[in-house]
From Swiss-Prot:
PROSITE patterns: RADICAL_SAM. HAMAP family: RNA_methyltr_RlmN. It comes from Chlorobium phaeobacteroides (strain BS1). Residues 105-341 form the Radical SAM core domain. Disulfide bonds join C112-C346. [4Fe-4S] cluster binds at C119, C123, C126. This is Probable dual-specificity RNA methyltransferase RlmN. S-adenosyl-L-methionine binds at G171, E172, S204, S227, L228, H229, N303. NCBIfam families: rRNA_mod_RlmN. GO terms for cellular component: cytoplasm.
Amino acid sequence: MPNSKTNIKAYTRQELRDTIAALGEPAYRADQIHRWLFSDWVTDFEKMKNISASLREELSRRYVIPSCSFENEAIEERSVSAPETSKFLVGLHDDEMVETVLIPSPDRHTVCVSSQVGCPLRCTFCATGYMGFTRNLLASEIVEQVLLVNERLGDRSPDNHVTNMVFMGMGEPLLNLNNVFDAIETLTNQSYNFSLSRKRITISTVGLIPQIGELARSGLSIKLAISLHAADQEKRTSLIPVAKEHTLEELRHALHEYADMVKEPVTLVYMLIEGVNDADQDAINLIRFAQGFLCKINLIDYNCIVNVKFNPVKAEKRDRFIHTLVNAGVHVTVRKSQGASIDAACGQLALQKKNKTASRPY
C-alpha cells in the first residue's frame, strides 16, 4: 500500500513556513525544522529536540522524511599523486536516480550536482539528453547530493568537505530555477553545517535568456558558465537544438548584462569536436563573440559517448585553435577533462548503472 504521508522535504523553505504557520505555529518553528532536516540531516521527527512533543507527533502523522542515498560509486584510477574523480549514483525517494561527481584537487573539493532526472534539451553531444526527461529535482535532492559527498569525504578524512559546487551534472538548472535557488540559499546559509560561499558556486546553462535575466535579478551573484560550443548560429543550433529560440547576438547581450550586474566574468565553455567547430573561422567567430564584455573561455575536449559519432580534435588542431585565440588577446583556459574513464566527464552522465545508457531517441 503506497504511503499517504507527504514528503516534508518537497517543500521549499517558504512553503514549509506557510505549512507550519497553518498548524498554528510561529514562523521561527519552520526555520528550526528546516535546520534539523538540512543542517543536522535527521530522518526522525523525534530527534528534533527543540520542537514540542505535540508538534513532533503531528508532523509524524502527516509527513515522512525520505533521504537520498548512494547506490553505487565509481572511482577513476589515476596516479598516486593525483586525486581521483569519483562518480556517485544517487537514489532518490521515488526510486529515480541521478549522478553526482566529486572532482578533487589539492586545494579544493568540487562537487558537480544534477538538477533534473534526465534533460529535455537533447544536445547532440550529451549523453544525458539522450535519456529524455523525467522530472525536476527537489531543492532537498540537490542539497543532499552535497550532504552525501560531504559524508563520503568525511569518511576519508575528518577535515575534508565540499568547497566548490557546479551545476554541471544532469539536467538544465535554469529550467528548475525555484528549486535551484532554494538549494543555494540552504547550502550558503552560514549558520548551517556547510562551508560553501556563493562565490564558489557556478551554474552552467545552454543559454536560456529569460532565465539568465531572472538569475541576474535574484541577487545571488552566482558565477555563470555558458555551454557555447559554437559562435555560428547554424552550427550551434545543430549541437544545441534549443539555441534556435534566440540569436547569438541576443545571447551575447544577455551575458553582457549578467556580467555587468554581478561583476564577475561569464565563462564561455567551448567543447572542441573534430570537423564540427574546430576550423580557423570557428576560432574567429568565437573571438568576435567574446569581445566587449567581461568573459573568459574554457576550452575542453569532446568526451566520447555511446552511439554518437563525434570525435575529439587532434592535438595539433587544438593547439592551432588555441594559438588563434591567444594571439587575439582572448583569456582562454584549456580545461583537462576529469572522469572520462568512468563516464563522469562533461557530457557523459547517463545513468549507465541503471541500464539507461545513451541511445538516440530521434
